[in-house]
């Protein structure tokens, strides 16, 4: 007599538990991060956060803020025109840069308006993880327990 045991593959187990990149646990975590990250992002009018919400696809394990100014805010450094050594200039239409200019990073830190988000600053992903990592891990644990 012969006995055969067929075990699922690691990938099948991961998918069954919702832990694959498009699984429900990952989607829950992405949604949770998106909700929580707001307080660490620069927030004056809310435009950057609203764009982030609109551009982030919850089924993907990433938060997206794809705007021309996002990297400046995210990294928290002043970028300048290599020719003028200025970040930009004011016009009647608002703040502008030379057309086609590729800016270079400086060592100067940006100054964030913290009137609405006191925790706003650079690398909001790291700030969120440092401040709320254990709480987010507990959220995932609760979610996984309730989905059994």
Segments and roles (model prediction):
Residues 1-70, 76-148:
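Short, Lys/Arg-rich flexible segments
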